[in-house]
Amino acid sequence: MDNIKIIVASDSIGETAELVARAGVSQFNPKQCKHEFLRYPYIESFENVDEVIQVAKDTNAIIVYTLIKPEIKKYMISKVNEHALKSVDIMGPLMELLSNSIEETPYYEPGMVHRLDDAYFKKIDAIEFAVKYDDGKDPKGLPKADIVLLGISRTSKTPLSQYLAHKSYKVMNIPIVPEVTPPDGLFNVDPSKCIALKISEEKLNRIRKERLKQLGLGDKARYATEARIQEELDYFEKLVDKIGCPVIDVSDKAIEETANDIIHFIEQNKSK
């Protein structure tokens, strides 16, 4: 028995149509259903359709297609009917059923599945990046980061990094401590990618005292004293002035509000 020719035609890469076709073929004895796939991706014109139709006529092939753009799909159907060819519309019936059920018009944009997949994997990469480079663990992350957060302890660097990662930004955060020299690479990073997180002395004092209580320690530890906090804030301001990056006051802001401010800064600089 001759091989059955199956033409996979799509206005995207054709992966969906081929997967469905292969699933169908797998239900038959391979000895009785010898087959060959011919993929025609990115069908964007009537001429592309004509090419598929000609090959189908010459080889007596079955056309399996996912064509989203209405004018291209309509032309394919007319040509298939004109030449009495065998064909299967993979997406059309489902899209029509969904459209009627929810009373909404489809986007009619090819490749949406892959765009969604790309967005998902980009977000996962960003989340993994935020974990790997949290708290300045590895300075090698600096040139790879979309955003570098700077701040002294208890300025919400880690939760902000995670929140922004879920927005698909690769974020590294670096703790600013007077006794610890910042990584050399920090001064080579574009200042427009750096965001310094500022907090008032009073607010930080309250947060740190509460943190010490949670740890079962007295609130008189140096970590929460006004002198220590002022020392850290002074060092922070000198470092930020040297870098020349934007500063956001997080004293009375929710994580979401601060994150939106950061995104605004970053996107504004991208458009310059």
Curated annotation (Swiss-Prot):
Keywords: Kinase, Nucleotide-binding, Serine/threonine-protein kinase, Transferase
Record Pfam families: Kinase-PPPase
Chain residues that bind ADP: G151, I152, S153, R154, T155, S156, K157, T158
Gene Ontology terms for molecular function: ADP binding; ATP binding; phosphotransferase activity, phosphate group as acceptor; protein serine/threonine kinase activity
Class of the enzyme per the UniProt entry, highest EC level: transferase
Top-level taxon of the source organism: Bacteria
InterPro entries: Kinase-pyrophosphorylase, PPDK_reg
EC number: 2.7.11.32, 2.7.4.27
Reaction(s) the record says it catalyses: N(tele)-phospho-L-histidyl/L-threonyl-[pyruvate, phosphate dikinase] + ADP = N(tele)-phospho-L-histidyl/O-phospho-L-threonyl-[pyruvate, phosphate dikinase] + AMP + H(+); N(tele)-phospho-L-histidyl/O-phospho-L-threonyl-[pyruvate, phosphate dikinase] + phosphate + H(+) = N(tele)-phospho-L-histidyl/L-threonyl-[pyruvate, phosphate dikinase] + diphosphate
Similarity section: Belongs to the pyruvate, phosphate/water dikinase regulatory protein family. PDRP subfamily.
Function: Bifunctional serine/threonine kinase and phosphorylase involved in the regulation of the pyruvate, phosphate dikinase (PPDK) by catalyzing its phosphorylation/dephosphorylation.
HAMAP family per UniProt: PDRP
Protein name: Putative pyruvate, phosphate dikinase regulatory protein 1
Gene source species: Staphylococcus epidermidis (strain ATCC 35984 / DSM 28319 / BCRC 17069 / CCUG 31568 / BM 3577 / RP62A)
